[in-house]
Amino acid sequence: VDLDLRLFNRLLGTHGQRVLWEVAIRCPCGGATGSQAAAISCPICGGTGWEFGPLIQEVRAVVVGFHRDVLYYDRMGPFEVGTVLMSMRPEHAPAYGDRMTLIDATMRMSETTTRTAGPVQRLRYAITEIDVTTATGTIKQSVLFARREANGVAGPELKRGTDFTIDASGRIDWSIGDAAGTAPRPGERFSIYYICRPAFRVISYPHTVRQTRGQKKSPEDYQVITPVQVMCRLEHLAMELLT
């Protein structure tokens, strides 16, 4: 049975999810240390070993098969695996390591991290603000809860607009908290529960060679290029595979 590529592309345009596709490029840092590992001090990749260049575009994809299995005692603790399969047009062929962000989807993320030296700090994912309808009306939500460390134990709660703000790139800006003396000091830990858009990294080599032969309404067979499918994993869970 031949695949009707025109029908697939038409359905993809009407029912596929909007995905921001960012091409990932290996960073050349780390050579000065004599190691293949990326340099933590690299101003381009920040130690991840990857940079995202100007090759960014919005595409449509069918996203299926979200798995979230918790494997206890694996790697000395719980390890969550969140993977999806994305199918897209043949001319859209992501490579291993590329970032795929669902533009119209959101999820909640709980994170504990350390305050950086500068006033602006990026979390695992960019903080996103959404409108939520309640019994009393529509409210905006982005950071749902945050708490700082104090002398090694849980300290006071942190409030948006009082202790920090969120910039246009979805990063935390500690400037007002630093001025008031309520923000975590550099090196101190804090926990934050926030809303973000799911960002995935491609962890399989795509089916760029998935082609077939057809002979529909033709005396001779011809080559048919079929849709591309890739396996992706939530970015913070995929970094172990991408190092």
PLM features: residue spans?
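N-terminal disorder-to-order initiation segments that are Gly/Lys/Arg-biased
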Residues: V1-P78, R201-T243
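A general secondary-structure signal for short beta-strands and their flanking turns/coil
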Residues: I56, F79-T83, G187
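A general sequence property marking short-to-moderate contiguous segments
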Residues: R68-V70, R99, M107-M109
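Amphipathic, membrane-inserting segments
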Residues: Y73-M76, S87-M88, I103-D104, S110-G118
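Short alpha-helix capping/helix-loop boundary micro-motifs
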Residues: V81-A93, I176-G177
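Loop/turn positions that initiate beta-strands
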Residues: A95-M100, G187
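Hydrophobic beta-strand signal
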Residues: T101-L102, S191
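Extended beta-strand solenoid/passenger and fiber regions
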Residues: M107-E188, Y193-R197, T212-P219
